[in-house]
Amino acid sequence: MYIRVTTYGFDEARIGEALAKMDATIRDDLKAIAGLESVEECRIGEGQAMIIARYDSEASATAAQEKIQVIFGDMAEFMTSQPEIKSGDVIWTL
């Protein structure tokens, strides 16, 4: 199992619009990515978010990057900072 954590800034005034776009378009795009097992997004501060994506392997995460970059490009209008990414193999789980 491999985890990728992405943090970024977003326009709080447009959060409803962003969530509607995610539900309408991005959900299906993410479901179609091979090896992507789950995605959770949470607000970590005013205008700040964190995405936690779980993949079956590092190879799947690497292979998905082109598609993920397209998705982030589609959502760029809502973002106020460049995404920062950290990732690694899971070493313990509950």
Q: Which ranges hold each PLM region?
A:
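Short S/T/G/P-rich N-terminal loop/turn motif that feeds into the first structured element of a domain
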Residues: 1-50, 56-70, 78-94
